[in-house]
UniProtKB/Swiss-Prot annotation:
Descriptive protein name: Glutamate dehydrogenase 2, mitochondrial
EC top class named in words: oxidoreductase
Binding residue positions for substrate: 81
Active site: 180
Organism: Hylobates lar
GO MF annotations in UniProt: glutamate dehydrogenase (NAD+) activity; glutamate dehydrogenase (NADP+) activity
Amino acid sequence: MYCYLGKALLPSGAGPAALGSAGAALLGRARGQPAAAPQPGLALAAWRHYSEVVADRKDDPNFFKMVEGFFDRGASIVEDKLVKDLRTRESEEQKRNRVRGILRIIKPCNHVLSLSFPIRRDDGSWEVIEGYRAQHSQHRTPCKGGIRYSADVSVDEVKALASLMTYKCAVVDVPFGGAKAGVKINPKNYTENELEKITRRFTMELAKKGFIGPGIDVPAPDMNTGEREMSWIADTYASTIGHYDINAHACVTGKPISQGGIHGRISATGRGVFHGIENFINEASYMSILGMTPGFGDKTFVVQGFGNVGLHSMRYLHRFGAKCIAVGESDGSIWNPDGIDPKELEDFKLQHGSILGFPKAKPYEGSILEADCDILIPAASEKQLTKSNAPRVKAKIIAEGANGPTTPEADKIFLERNIMVIPDLYVNAGGVTVSYFEWLKNLNHVSYGRLTFKYERDSNYHLLMSVQESLERKFGKHGGTIPIVPTAEFQDSISGASEKDIVHSALAYTMERSARQIMRTAMKYNLGLDLRTAAYVNAIEKVFKVYSEAGVTFT
């Protein structure tokens, strides 16, 4: 439920003054008045009695309640605007009740499927596998969210990740509701044959309950899953319940190219992390607050987690001039102040199965999260940055490559310490953005650019010829004496953009546009470096608008 307890809890006539001078200053700032206090979202939530629902376990909060707490901060900021923007013939009180009612609808997880099924292992023994699929919101359909294989999967985790997917899709304007799935296994303990059995059976269980389909719910890769598992899912669905559905392969994204996948999907999340950092690190106003110069040129960074997201984030930052000085994994960390080459480290890990022992770096003692660097990229799992270690973090920019790596208490500490946190619901949205492109490709049954490649190339050459002929007529020259020659960059462009070029361009545009929206919201509400609350405000506004304009039918 939406954690708003009502004005009855305030003394008669209470308002901003009830917060004291500091709280009133914060509230005034949230309404656009100048003030020096740094966290208006927290103060306004306190005044309106939005529950900071994570207070029960400050250093290890319930993951779903943690996301709800962040939602409440954004809701407390944007509520007045939502009331003001309602174009209904209702009183102020009725409008506010309507707004709060819709916000209550947005917050909970709509459906959670818990299931178990048996498999026969290669040694002849039998095992019961547990799995979950949570659908947070159907304000847009289909629902969208990854499938992870982990022994630590829980109902709380998939609910939290599903809710994050709803807000993430809204932030980057991808028309999906949020969902997430988890299978409670450690994939390292199973053979490929056993993993295929588990994946195909899990797909059938989802299909029987109506939790998968091109227009219903579309999974994607996540922790410990990739193209292989997505291909099994697509084949299982298309061969059974989707046998008569021409769009059957759109039931899942992150597939191999031969199965309807899209170029650029594997690197999409890491590339999105790079673009997310790029948009803020090149913004002089934010860099001046942090006491840093714009650009990647002189920056150092640390990556926690050398999986798909960590590797590709590292690649792109390295390519644009930043220096990776440390990488951390679950079995240990390595350090080299002169820099670590991502390709060399990737090759070493593929050969040895671990980053430990990499000859061009030394073992790092202590927490990699507390290493001295400019940019920290936590790309492992949730709740890594907590109240305990946040005071010792030395980075000035934290880019949340993982989902939910920062607890609310740590988030408050970072704001107090003037550390910029680029939030997960924006910075790791590259994966779902490119999944959206793949889903559209599957529905259209044609790859991007195939219908226009040659036409665009010929049009560009005709344009150059037209310019050349016009100049020759003007100066009385004929026969190609004033040749118009394209530059090398333009020549590459007009020779025909590949599908990967189109995907990369669209992803960069999406991340840039979303970053500008977050910056404008942060400026509008005087949120300073509280980019997370700004992103939640944007997400809440967009989801609220869908519910408000569609109407709440069956109530």
